[in-house]
């Protein structure tokens, strides 16, 4: 593994550089789909941490419902101007982008993105309980043609935490989904999302998660700290019931370090922590509104302690 870009962990930018041979950036598009925790199937108030936007970033908030091509044409000029990228991936980010019984609709929106002359591949955010056999077949078919990354919302492997987060699935569901992806859609690059810092997490949850991912076949991991945002169930609990503990930057960094040390060095890290893109809606932890302070703190903390991804991997 090439740690040259980063001495502590395998970076996503390095991984994309290897895949595409160029700087690559994601362009957010909306699929118009919802989630089983929003439409009444598993509940109506969404996962406890998720706000009205369905976990989207700033760039994803304009243009929902327009055709995929229109959305890409609208966003690409601004992104080209802001980021010196040569390659672009269409990123179906918000809500659950495989959640429909109509697989022809999925094929239509994915193909629309892939047929755009400037798009080199797809990133699709989804849940482990929203992958039918038909969807896996479609994903594999597309992934044999073009780069396709599936961002899988695992969040935790611990059932107590998944219940506390009101995810509507258990840890085994994620393990099973990763196995089915490995067997039925081996060309898909799976990236698992994890949240550290729920008060229900066991002390050894970072190591447990790393070990489960090591044997899962995933290519990457995206890490988030637990954040309390306005317009979420967590915010309601925080205000109406009791303030639960959230991790300080140092505590979170310690958990990430333990996770990294047990993680296979071949698995790339797409993100070390999440940035709250709407500062005015962040309740806690306050460090989540800063981009560079946590980044620099974590790098320094790792350097001071000689933290390296995979140092305890066996």
Predicted feature descriptions by range:
Residues 57-66, 94-107, 122-185, 196-216, ...:
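Conserved non-cysteine loop/helix-boundary elements of the Radical SAM core domain that shape
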Residues 47, 110-119, 208-222, 293-308:
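Structural recognition of alpha->loop->beta junctions
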Residues 116-119, 180-190, 216, 254-268:
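A structural motif corresponding to the C-terminal end of an alpha-helix
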């Amino acid at each position: 593994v090439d740690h040259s870009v980063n001495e502590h962990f395998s970076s996503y930018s390095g991984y994309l550089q290897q895949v595409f041979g160029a700087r690559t950036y994601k362009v957010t598009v909306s699929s118009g789909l919802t989630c089983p925790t929003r439409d009444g199937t598993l509940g109506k108030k969404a996962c406890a941490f998720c706000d009205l936007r369905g976990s989207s970033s700033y760039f994803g908030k304009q243009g929902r419902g327009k055709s995929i091509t229109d959305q890409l044409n609208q966003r690409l000029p601004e992104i080209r101007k802001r980021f010196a990228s040569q390659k672009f991936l269409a990123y179906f980010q918000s809500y659950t982008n495989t959640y429909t019984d109509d697989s022809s609709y999925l094929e239509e929106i994915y193909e629309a993105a892939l047929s755009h002359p400037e798009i080199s591949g797809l990133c699709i955010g989804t849940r482990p309980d929203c992958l039918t056999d038909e969807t896996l077949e479609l994903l594999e078919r597309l992934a044999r043609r073009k780069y396709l990354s599936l961002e899988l919302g695992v969040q935790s492997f611990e059932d107590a935490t998944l219940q506390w987060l009101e995810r509507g699935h258990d840890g085994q569901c994620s393990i099973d989904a990763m196995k089915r992806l490995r067997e039925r859609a081996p060309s898909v690059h799976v990236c698992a999302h994890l949240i550290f810092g729920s008060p229900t997490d066991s002390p050894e949850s970072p190591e447990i998660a790393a070990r489960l991912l090591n044997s899962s076949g995933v290519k990457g991991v995206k890490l988030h700290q637990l954040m309390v945002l306005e317009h979420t169930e967590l915010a309601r609990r925080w205000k109406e019931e009791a303030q639960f503990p959230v991790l300080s930057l140092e505590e979170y960094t310690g958990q990430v370090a333990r996770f990294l040390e047990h993680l296979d060095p071949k698995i790339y890290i797409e993100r070390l922590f999440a940035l709250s893109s709407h500062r005015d809606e962040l309740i806690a932890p306050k460090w989540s509104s800063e981009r560079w302070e946590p980044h620099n703190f974590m790098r320094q903390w790792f350097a001071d302690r000689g933290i390296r991804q995979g140092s305890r991997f066996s």
